[in-house]
Every structure is written in C-alpha cells, then in structure tokens.
Amino acid sequence: MAPRRLLRGLRRSMGGAGLALCVGLASPVAAEVITGARFEGPTTRYGHAILGDGIEFTELVIETEDWANKVRYRVTLPADHVFEDLEPRLWDITDDGAPEVVVIETDMARGGSLAVYDQTGKIAETPHIGRTNRWLAPVGAADLDGDGRIEVAFVDRPHLAKVLRVFEWDGTALVLDMELGGLTNHRIGEDFITGGLRVCGGMPELITADADWSDVMVTRVVGGALQTASLGPFSPAAVEAALACR
C-alpha cells in the first residue's frame, strides 16, 4: 500500500517529448538493468482526482545500471496523457529476469491503461478503458497459470465495473487472457491500492476485496480459469495477514 507523494529529484533532462537520455553513457559490454523509477512533472491538467487530489504526473524517470555506468532516461507524455498513479512498479513482465516499469497511463479522453516501459520506451500497453474519468488499479504480475509466461492483473474500474482482468505477455504484447467480476481493490479518494500478489506454497495468488468490501478475497488460476474464495471478513489487518500467507 504505497503512499501518494510527489517524487522529486533529477532535473537534467534534455527536454522534448518521448524518451530522452538524461545522464551517463550506456556500456556496450553488459546489458543495462532497470534499478529504479519515479514520476516527475506534477500537473493538474486532468481533474479526475481518484487518488484523493488533483495532481498527476507527466514524466517518468527510469534509472538503469550496467557494470560500469548509471544511466537515467526520461519519458515525457503528450499533452493529452498523464500518469494517474502512485509510484512506478518494477515488475518483470517479459520474464527475462530483469524488471520493466509498470504504470497507470491515462488518456484524458479515453481513460486508464496499464503501460509497460523499459529504457527503450513503451513496450506494451493494455487498451484504454474507453472514456474519460475511468481508471484501473494494478494487483500484481507473475506466471499465474504455470504456462511459462507472465500475466499481469488489475481491477478494471474498481469503483464501477469491479472486474479483475488478467493480461498475458505473449512475447510482443499484452493480450487479455482471463477475467472475473465481483472484486475490487480501491475506494475513491484513497491514496493507496489494497491487496496485491502473494506466493504461498509456491503458488502465486491475488489478494483483493470483494465488491462490497465485506471480505478479503484470494484469487488463483485453476484449470485455466480464475477461481476466487473468501479468506474472511475484510479489515486492513486481514489484508496484511493474507499477503503474508498467515
């Protein structure tokens, strides 16, 4: 449950739209590995305020390292997009042993999407929800069904539709794989997302609430389909216990 805050720091960007090399030179000897990411460029140009304030972000700074160098890249969004998010997530989506950067990227006319970046720019994105002021809340990423490919899960419109959607990385894109209704992980105005991914006994599972916030729910893939069950009455302590496999 990450607190919402303005992340400040690097200001030595080359400027301009898209991806900019900010600091250092990449080494030709060893591959760069992403070690950190943060949002910059706070903006009030999108008034959704789903996370409790009217401040979103226009820039994503990605930090990488190789054997000799530390490099920073800056992604600057076009004027009709914002990062409607808390913090960037370092999740391995491509299953190469190194993380990518996963963010909520919102088109101000078409709503939220889940976008994946690396140091080359955006490498994948789920479809935008379809209209303004519509958002999604990430849950986690893992090989949920044991097929050797990574799936990434989020709740589509956690205040309205309350549908858990699972997209699979197919080697070039994120493709819708499974979905299940009746689950949520965010309430309007909260500056955190409830639940997440846990691995208990070697099995990745998704922790959320049910649609009316009465129960903590655990969802796993069984026989190629999502299966959900209650872990008991909802409370913040119960969510923490569930994530810790207690």
Positions of the model-derived regions?
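N-terminal secretory signal peptides that target proteins for export/translocation
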Residues: M1-L10
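Beta-propeller-forming repeat regions
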Residues: R4, P28-R246
